[in-house]
Swiss-Prot record:
It is an enzyme of class 1 (oxidoreductase). It catalyses: homogentisate + O2 = 4-maleylacetoacetate + H(+). It comes from the Bacteria. The keyword Ion transport does not apply. Pfam families: HgmA_C, HgmA_N. GO terms for molecular function: homogentisate 1,2-dioxygenase activity; iron ion binding. Its EC number is 1.13.11.5. This is Homogentisate 1,2-dioxygenase. Involved in the catabolism of homogentisate (2,5-dihydroxyphenylacetate or 2,5-OH-PhAc), a central intermediate in the degradation of phenylalanine and tyrosine. Catalyzes the oxidative ring cleavage of the aromatic ring of homogentisate to yield maleylacetoacetate. It comes from Rhodopseudomonas palustris (strain HaA2). Fe cation binds at H346, E352, H382. Hexamer; dimer of trimers.
Amino acid sequence: MNINAAPQIIGHGSQGVTPGYMSGFGNSFETEALPGALPIGRNSPQRAAYGLYAEQLSGSPFTAPRGANERSWLYRIRPSVKHSGRFTKADMGLWRSAPCLEYDMPIAQLRWDAPSMPQEDLTFLQGVRTMTTAGDVNTQAGMATHMYLITQSMVDQHFYNADGELMFVPQQGSLRLVTEFGVISIEPAEIAVIPRGVKFRVELVDGPARGYLCENYGGAFTLPERGPIGANCLANSRDFLTPVAAYEDRDVPTELFVKWGGALWQTTLPHSPIDVVAWHGNYAPYKYDLRTFSPVGAIGFDHPDPSIFTVLTSPSETAGTANIDFVIFPERWMVAENTFRPPWYHMNIMSEFMGLICGVYDAKPQGFVPGGASLHNMMLPHGPDREAFDHASNGELKPVKLTGTMAFMFETRYPQRVTEYAATAGTLQDDYADCWRGLEKRFDPSRP
């Protein structure tokens, strides 16, 4: 199949509601780009069809419980051992990994404006700017948050991350992620997740692109438990899309970059590694449209905890304490009676990195801009600014629909340490704390 053509659903078992994708979360998928490329009833035939090589990609130990066991079988033109060659260290640029102690910054609530799009040519790897790190990449715990600024597609360059899975959150411009498993296209208000070890390249679709990137060192993202919410709402499994098989058979010099142990390595290949003709399994990249998230909330009074907006969670070994929660604040109705409707003032055991894809965030109508970010680390107080407080305290409590907005949060159990880049960036707002300065003493013991 020509990788430059739109991927199609071809062959045995490739069922999906959208051309090019298969619907579902964590399914055991199967797809082939050439008829008969996928063996039936076995994984490793003596001679695979079309002269392909059978290769397993494992995302969990062999003995992981069945519900947590992740692997896929790939039928490819060349095995990955043919891809490795000799690796040499490459320049990491502004990409950092935990633990990153390069800058000792005083604790504070922090907020950044959106970075400007650079004029120079920057591919994905050159355009990553790490904002915070948490945990330890070598113990497979924690995360890193990054911004990406891309002005040039990767050409004859590919990458995979052995340290963690990557979640792309576009804010400006669309991306085409050409992966071993197939092609994923995403735009602002969509996300994509690329598991550890999956080779891919990043291409621009409609000009320069800016967005956020979460690097998850810990357990793979999964859907949160709904508890008493029941069987529906929040992020529904059917809205997650995994690409059908698409491959290229190109014998051209290609650079392969690997992030491993917090460092970047590279080698040169004589061919493209995007050569998987068929695959089956439950370890694969996927995309999700955040606009399909079905929010739930208070329909009587009070403001519920933000955990009800969790799209995906990376669990830790402690039940209910996430390695990462990915939370969004989408369009929704505000109807609670006799209630302060914005998020309340808070001190939290978790550390919160927030971004804004579009619109206005209801707790911060000023200063928190699309493409910007904020960091509220563990046990540092935060909450609505003066303007939001006054409006919510005195406004008419009629039903109001928040429209045209999409904020998100990467929340982790670990403290998030700020990188030197983030601490010295010209986009760092030195007056962020002033947004609370106008909150005056209102206490009057004579007026209950």
